[in-house]
């Protein structure tokens, strides 16, 4: 089935994964947890123990006011919801959530509050100059 994969430090991408439990678990690296934070018929599938096992923090989940209420650790993906099972993510939902999760995030505590700092996209990074000697 077609899903939108979101990995820590990377831009989201669409990919195909199997709909069986083993394939879902392989995609997140462990037992799965499905959460339903959106009005759209979409599930966010993540590693159930990602934070406990120390997987890298990935993206923040925000409420309607833009406030962070949770942070997903490790890989996660977005999948469509059928009548009684997961299904392909609709193209319009893939586009919407690819934009929402476009920028990788780093996290910091500031004045007792956790903030998410959007990181530049890989192609936006400034080239590194060599400081090994004079340029010719």
Question: Where on the chain are the PLM-derived regions?
Answer:
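Non-Sec secretion/translocation targeting segments of pathogen effectors
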Residues: 123-136
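N-terminal nucleophile
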Residues: 1-11, 15-121, 127
């Amino acid at each position: 089935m077609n899903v939108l994969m979101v990995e820590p430090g990377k831009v989201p991408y669409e990919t195909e994964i199997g709909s069986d439990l083993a394939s879902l678990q392989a995609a997140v690296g462990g037992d799965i947890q499905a959460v339903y934070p959106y009005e759209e018929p979409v599930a966010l599938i993540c590693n159930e123990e990602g934070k406990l096992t120390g997987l890298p923090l990935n993206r923040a989940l925000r409420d309607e006011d833009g406030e962070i209420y949770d942070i997903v650790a490790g890989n996660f993906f977005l999948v469509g919801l059928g009548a009684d099972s997961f299904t392909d993510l609709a193209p319009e939902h893939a586009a919407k959530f690819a934009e929402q999760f476009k920028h990788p995030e780093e996290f910091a505590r500031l004045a007792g509050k956790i903030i998410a700092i959007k990181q530049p996209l890989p192609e936006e990074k400034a080239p590194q100059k060599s400081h090994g000697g004079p340029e010719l």
